[in-house]
């Protein structure tokens, strides 16, 4: 029997919950991406297939990647560990070092899956101040009642540490 390990969520969203448009970020804030890179560097990242396909391959050189996909065989030639279900995911993370940080990085379907099943211990959410159009959302209602701590703020965004109470 193993203890269920929870992930740390890390994503950016507008106040309306927009996280992507056409499998890409609708904004360009290099400092915010640097924060993502430095926070997740050297750790395990979890994502859905669309997020995986949108990321540059170089990101996987310093991170272990677990990718949810309905058809993992299609992606086997690429770097990463591919899973079809939460059960397969639990098996994989049970084999990781107990001190290994695990970050759930999106997209929308995976974020909602992890939040619905309470698989997130805390969430680093960058709130983008400007409105953008998009086609992928993060339902920010999931964070109602979570404690917010401001990590950084500037004119373009605020980085929050959200803790589930």
Enumerate the predicted regions with their spans.
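Enzymes that bind and transform nitrogen-containing heteroaromatic metabolites
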Residues: 2-165
